[in-house]
From Swiss-Prot:
It comes from Escherichia coli O9:H4 (strain HS). This is Glutamate-1-semialdehyde 2,1-aminomutase. The lineage of its organism: Bacteria, Pseudomonadati, Pseudomonadota, Gammaproteobacteria, Enterobacterales. It comes from the Bacteria. Keywords: Cytoplasm, Isomerase, Porphyrin biosynthesis, Pyridoxal phosphate. The gene is hemL. The modification N6-(pyridoxal phosphate)lysine is found at residue 265. Its cofactor is pyridoxal 5'-phosphate. One of its GO terms (biological process) is protoporphyrinogen IX biosynthetic process.
């Protein structure tokens, strides 16, 4: 047995499923998950000593690559002053100044410890600010594991939500309406059925949890207009897209202004950080200045703030996002060319430093139904064959891939060459 297999066997006796987050267990592709020893730049190294070109990037945070010296040094320097104080620090102020400068729609920001905390808190704030209970989310979009968000669509677009996890009371889920991504008609229908009850829409501006599905040109502006028409708030969940699709996020890339923004992943530089913020009048409703409660023992942790501050300063340097786009575009085009040579139908969506690979005969993939029609079994085989070639992709047909500026064009070309060999046998 390999070291990964031995560790996985031991882990399953001690940790549910052997992992601390389900997708890591390779349940979406089968087989034994890799146990990682270290990472540097664009590469992961497993406990058996094998190196992989990494397109998971810790599920998004590693936009600069692994073990970036500026972040590592910031963490070491901060740790030497203490690990946690439970009191305000100067770095929290500096971090808030930087975030609000980089994302102009955020007048104020509150730091939390995860993307789930950010979305959960933003929704509570939207409900408290509007005095309404219902929210709209989209089929195939993921916003963390808060109870009100673990909801699937019912039998029709306007049915009340049903829990998609045991442990979520139906009374919670009934306040969540699930509409179809990229379908404004379904959203208008929900508003017309509940015109005075919907507090907010929460949306991934690029859906990264049904692989990678960009918005149609009219979709995000249409959501903004509907929120304005019916007095609801628009929450853009940029946990995945923030500082990756563009420096000011997907909201800037697509030209739409939310009322609230949720951030995570890159904002922590690899440390557990989330944030939410937006309009001053809305944020003023948050405790201690307002009645909507939110708190956290480790929120604004000095080590995490130092890592995030260093990361964002590097991400804000000229050329970073142009490099991400160039590398991702080359990878997408190369994969499509290699698939076409092998006669394999393939769609590759990409925006900024995000991409998604779909085995499908369709010309495009624009919604959850399109994603579900793709050939998942072929993806599973592709994943494992690429892993054997030393390329680490997301171990699920429903997760986006992530580029970093640490990837070289040689890494990209080697990945395309590996895919060409795999497609020939697929």
């Amino acid at each position: 047995m390999s070291k990964s297999e031995n560790l996985y066997s031991a882990a399953r006796e001690l940790i549910p499923g052997g992992v601390n987050s389900p997708v890591r267990a390779f349940t979406g592709v089968g087989g034994t998950p890799l146990f990682i020893e270290k990472a540097d730049g664009a590469y992961l190294y497993d406990v058996d000593g094998k190196a992989y070109i990494d397109y998971v990037g810790s599920w998004g945070p590693m936009v600069l690559g692994h073990n970036h010296p500026a972040i590592r040094n910031a963490v070491i320097e901060a740790a030497e002053r203490g690990l946690s104080f439970g009191a305000p620090t100067e770095m929290e102020v500096k971090m808030a100044q930087l975030v609000t400068e980089l994302v102009p729609t955020m007048d104020m920001v509150r730091m939390v410890n995860s993307g789930t905390e950010a979305t959960m808190s933003a929704i509570r704030l939207a409900r408290g600010f509007t005095g309404r209970d219902k929210i709209i989310k989209f089929e195939g979009c993921y916003h963390g594991h808060a109870d009100c968000l673990l909801v699937k669509a019912g039998s029709g677009a306007l049915t009340l939500g049903q829990p998609n996890s045991p442990g979520v009371p139906a009374d919670f889920a009934k306040h969540t309406l699930t509409c179809t991504y990229n379908d404004l008609a379904s959203v208008r229908a929900a508003f017309e059925q509940y015109p005075q009850e919907i507090a907010c829409i929460i949306v991934e501006p690029v859906a990264g949890n049904m692989n990678c599905v960009p918005p149609l040109p009219e979709f995000l502006p249409g959501l903004r207009a509907l929120c304005d028409e019916f007095g609801a708030l628009l929450i853009i969940d940029e946990v995945m897209t923030g500082f990756r699709v563009a420096l000011a996020g997907a909201q800037d890339y697509y030209g739409v202004e939310p009322d609230l923004t949720c951030l995570g992943k890159i904002i922590g530089g690899g440390m557990p950080v989330g944030a939410f913020g937006g309009r001053r009048d809305v944020m003023d409703a948050l405790a201690p200045t307002g009645p909507v409660y939110q708190a956290g023992t480790l929120s604004g942790n000095p080590i995490a703030m130092a890592a995030g501050f260093a990361c964002l300063n590097e991400v804000a340097q000229p050329g970073v996002h142009e490099t991400l786009d160039e590398l991702t575009t080359r990878l997408a085009e190369g994969l499509l060319e290699a698939a076409e040579e092998a006669g394999i139908p393939l769609v590759v969506n990409h925006v900024g430093g995000m991409f998604g690979i779909f085995f499908t005969d369709a010309e495009s993939v624009t919604c959850y139904q399109d994603v579900m029609a793709c050939d998942v079994e072929r993806f599973k085989r592709f994943f494992h064959m690429m892993l054997d070639e030393g390329v680490y992709l997301a171990p699920s047909a429903f997760e986006a891939g992530f580029m970093s500026v640490a990837h070289s064009m040689e890494d990209i070309n080697n990945t395309i060459d590996a895919a060409r060999r795999v497609f020939a046998k697929l």
